Design a protein with these regions (language model features):
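Short strand-turn segments of transmembrane beta-barrel domains in outer membranes
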Residues: 156, 165-203, 212-226, 732
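C-terminal beta-signal and adjacent terminal beta-strands/loops
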Residues: 667, 735-753, 783-852
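Outer-membrane beta-barrel signature, preferentially recognizing the C-terminal barrel domain
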Residues: 276-300, 304, 487, 537-546, ...
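Gram-negative outer-membrane beta-barrel transporters
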Residues: 618-620, 641-746, 849-851
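Surface-exposed extracellular loop regions of Gram-negative outer-membrane beta-barrel proteins
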Residues: 263-264, 268, 464-465, 469-472, ...
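Signature of Gram-negative outer-membrane beta-barrel scaffolds
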Residues: 394, 420-556, 581, 683
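Acidic/polar loop-and-plug regions of large Gram-negative outer-membrane beta-barrel proteins
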Residues: 246-304, 327-396, 459-477, 627-630
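Short acidic/polar hinge/loop motifs at secondary-structure boundaries
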Residues: 93-95, 122-153, 170-176, 277
Length: 852
């Protein structure tokens, strides 16, 4: 039934043939007709562009794809063809990494756990959710740009890698580029000003190297009325070289507080006349106040030791110690009306009487503040509802505190000029503490640690107690309440890799084994689950592994063909294993390791006037799990939808090209054409928060349903001009299509279709919700000038960069989701309509850097 919805995946054959013939002509001309180029020594570090701009597409030319001198040698019929070198991003990622991000593009359609990031050889991926906590080092762009990149299954010597891509960051002071820089950024993005200072000293005669960097970001207002952002980032690293040993210490972190944006319905856009409307703020005594904040601060201490045991043997050991906290704020209420101004019962669409609906529209037009939080009213309710001023409303923090210890050791052995082997072991311990905390009582005197939903469904019972060990607890500002538990996660990992280089072939392989265990520790004894919520639960153990192999054929120093394949198994994420860890230790019944198969094949051309990459990929993932929690109108309760046996398949083509039209002028193109679908029919079960049994079981009818939340077709085209290394101009466009909203599983069940009124077509309920196509135009320019040159050779430089995104000033849909609440009896999609995120229109960034 749903197969017909995928016609948009198919690009017309005539269009494809024209593209193929065009590119074939370019390849033939560049790869086989051009004379060899003169040897050119490329700089391995960017010495003039501003690395703090988070924009890689316009500086692809600085990435070191191959060594040009080796290329010219490769054209001289040498018996040994050099291997392809990549110290920076591959061409496709460099062009698309920034431009496609507006639509949440993910390479190959993979989720976050199939991408990896490491710092000083320690993986940053979290065991809890598989995510990479980029915010932990945000703002330190001047030092964190020192990294290497491996796309897909490409070989690397640091980690196994990932199916998506891998980034390996080195923050040892002695491996950073010596510099003294002052940077000022002005922007109309989330933050408006950024000030940064970075100083990296060269290694002195006694073997010491020191590096430091600090940055401050802040912004108030701008595109969004209640936007606020403040962040302070810091970095310090010191190295000491003693004979064959290098000892390193690095301390870094980012303390950041900022408001968040919410998705909105089209009805709210029509009512307010703005796609930038946000329901999470209002006026308090005439001043703007936002209820939706997030905070993050996780300092990291990294210790490392490199020991060159032999000219062919190297040992690298690293230790990570990190602890910190992040939280989001939100309004909570008890026995009171919903304070959110966008609550569906407060909107005209809720009323079936057209006169009432029109009257409400008129009220909103006369008083737009009706669609904002009425803070003064919340304070009045808290102070006047009861004599003891017990809180009806409060502002809560949803807190996650973490402690991490990771130890990694790797041996690198160069057996001969052709054979490199490495062995690696890693131990990881992560402890997470989850709880709610009172941020502000909003004028009330206290609150009570009770479960409102249990009181509604089980009146008069002990189920109302969030903590039976401390019943009827009065709570105040900064007290914990609601839920309170810890997760103890451990993993042992062993890895072996081999890289073998032959005159015409390169071969690589890697094998990894890992053992993971999870254990929940309840700090509260929940009133609904008194026997299954407090103390340590039974641990879960998982054994998994990965294997990958790759073969590259080196036709000559310009043309490379490769094939790579991998098989991987991963434990379920702990957040998908437990049904509702907030209140109990209950787990899914159908628990299994997630398996993934991947194969990719491609071609790389690196000629003097043309650089080209083409990569075809096929990925199949099975036995994935998920948990969704939301309020269910049918059960009149918070419910947890558990999904198991989720399968998916991603296949497609990544193509990128940089063609030199003339001296200094380059045409850039990148295309991702994919087809990402769910396979099979996952199992689902429903368990309410306040019930100890499964309420419903079944299967989801999503076989061949599109994977949602990202564009499956994306095209980048750009013209870049560079003059004498001092001036850079880039004009580019991005087209993105074939994207759908994150879906509601209820609408794809048998029960949803059976309960619909006879006059409704069930396809209207089950078909995916598409997002409109998007076309974006960007512009960037950079200029560098030397202010003063000294006799010893060093000089002062002043560098400028100006970037404008979304030149056409469109407020496009960047993403969204189907609401998890659904009108099951009536099938009315307008009762809980889709919610969308919108871009903020034209954004600019001006950067000025002074390099000493």
């Amino acid at each position: 039934m749903l197969v017909n919805t995928f016609n948009l995946f198919v690009i017309p054959q005539v269009y494809f043939m024209r593209i193929l013939f065009f590119f074939f002509g370019l390849i033939h001309a560049a790869a086989f007709a051009q004379p060899p180029s003169k040897p050119i020594s490329l700089k391995s570090k960017n010495q003039w562009v501003d690395s703090s701009l988070d924009k890689d597409g316009w500086k692809y030319f600085q990435d070191q794809y191959t060594d040009e001198s080796a290329l010219s040698e490769g054209n001289e019929e040498m018996p040994f063809v050099p291997s392809l070198l990549e110290s920076g991003k591959d061409l496709f990622s460099s062009l698309t990494g920034f431009s496609f991000s507006i639509r949440r593009f993910r390479m190959k359609g993979l989720n976050n756990r199939y991408f990896s990031q490491s710092i000083n050889e320690i993986s940053m991926n979290q065991l809890s959710d598989g995510n990479i906590p980029w915010a932990n080092w945000g703002g330190l762009n001047e030092v964190t740009s020192n990294n290497q990149y491996a796309a897909g299954l490409k070989e690397n010597e640091y980690q196994f890698g990932a199916l998506g891509n891998s980034v390996f960051m080195q923050l040892n002071a002695s491996k950073l580029f010596p510099q003294t820089t002052f940077t000022l950024n002005l922007s109309n993005r989330n933050y408006h000003q950024r000030f940064a200072f970075t100083k990296v000293w060269s290694e002195n005669k006694k073997g010491w190297t020191i590096a430091t960097s600090v940055a401050f970001k802040q912004g108030i207002g701008g595109q969004l009325t209640a936007n606020e952002f403040i962040g302070f980032s810091y970095f310090f690293s010191i190295d000491k070289r003693v004979d064959n040993h290098l000892f390193s210490l690095a301390l870094l972190g980012n303390r950041q507080m900022n408001t968040r944006t919410a998705a909105i319905t089209k009805e709210l856009v029509d009512l307010t006349g703005s796609k930038q409307y946000q329901p999470s703020w209002g006026l308090q005594t005439g001043k703007v106040r936002n209820a939706n904040w997030q905070f993050n601060h996780h300092p990291m201490l990294l210790l490392s030791h490199e020991y060159n045991m032999h000219e062919k043997i190297k040992q690298v050991s690293s230790l990570l110690v990190s602890m910190g906290e992040k939280y989001t704020t939100a309004l909570d209420w008890f026995n009171a009306a919903d304070p959110r101004p966008d609550y569906y019962r407060y909107l005209p669409s809720f009323f079936t009487d057209s006169l009432l609906a029109q009257d409400l529209i008129s009220q909103i037009q006369l008083n737009p503040s009706q669609l904002q939080i009425n803070w003064d009213h919340l304070y009045w309710i808290n102070q006047n509802s009861t004599t003891d001023k017990r809180a009806r409303y409060l502002l809560e923090d949803r807190v996650e505190q973490s402690k991490k210890v990771v130890l990694n050791t790797r041996y690198r052995i160069q057996l001969n000029n052709r054979l490199l082997v490495s062995f690696q072991g890693q131990y990881r311990l992560e402890i997470y503490h989850y709880f709610k905390r009172i941020n502000d009582l909003l004028g009330a005197a206290y609150s009570i640690n009770w479960n409102q939903f249990a009181e509604d469904n089980l009146p008069g019972s002990t189920a109302i107690q969030n903590d039976l060990n401390n019943p009827n607890q009065k709570i105040y500002v900064n007290d914990q309440f609601g839920y309170n538990y810890r997760m103890h996660l451990q993993q042992w990992l062993f890895l072996s890799q081999v890289q073998y280089t032959l005159p015409k072939f390169d071969f690589n392989a890697a094998v990894e084994y890992n053992a993971t265990n999870y254990q929940r520790e309840g700090i509260y004894r929940n009133g609904v689950f008194p026997q299954n919520s407090y103390g340590l639960a039974e641990p879960d153990y998982f054994r998994n592994g990965q294997i990958k192999m790759g073969l590259t054929y080196k036709l000559n120093g310009r043309n490379y063909y490769y094939f790579r394949t991998a098989y991987s198994t991963k434990p379920p994420l702990v957040n998908d294993l437990y049904i509702s860890p907030r209140i109990s230790s209950h787990k899914q019944t159908d628990i299994s390791n997630e398996t993934a198969y991947m194969a990719e094949a491609g071609y790389i051309l690196h000629a003097p006037s043309l650089k080209l990459t083409a990569n075809a990929y096929w990925i199949s993932i099975h036995h994935a799990m998920d948990v969704m929690s939301f309020y269910h109108d049918g059960y009149r309760n918070l419910v947890n939808y558990t999904l198991s046996n989720i399968g998916s398949r991603m296949m497609g083509l990544e193509f990128s090209m940089a063609y030199s039209l003339s001296a200094g002028l380059t045409l850039n193109t990148a295309i991702n054409a994919g087809k990402y679908i769910y396979l099979q029919r996952p199992n689902y079960s429903v368990m309410a928060d306040n019930e100890q049994y499964i309420s419903e079981k079944g299967i989801l009818y999503i076989d061949h349903f599109p994977i949602t939340g990202l564009p499956q077709l994306a095209v980048y085209t750009g013209l870049a001009y560079r003059s004498n290394g001092n001036l850079f101009l880039n004009l580019s466009s991005s087209f993105m299509a074939n994207q759908w909203l994150s879906f509601n599983p209820i609408r794809r069940t048998y029960g949803a279709a059976q309960n619909l009124p006879s006059n409704l077509d069930n396809k209207l309920i089950s078909n995916p919700s598409a997002i409109p196509k998007a076309f974006i135009v960007d512009f960037s320019a950079g200029y560098s000038c030397r202010i003063k040159k000294f006799r010893d050779g060093h000089a002062y430089y002043l560098q400028f960069f100006f970037g404008v995104n979304n030149l056409l000033n469109q407020s496009i849909v960047t993403g969204g989701y189907e609401q998890l609440r659904f009108d099951t009896p009536g099938g009315d999609l307008n009762k809980f309509p889709n919610k969308y995120y919108y871009s903020a229109g034209t954004l600019y960034s001006l950067s000025i850097k002074w390099k000493l």
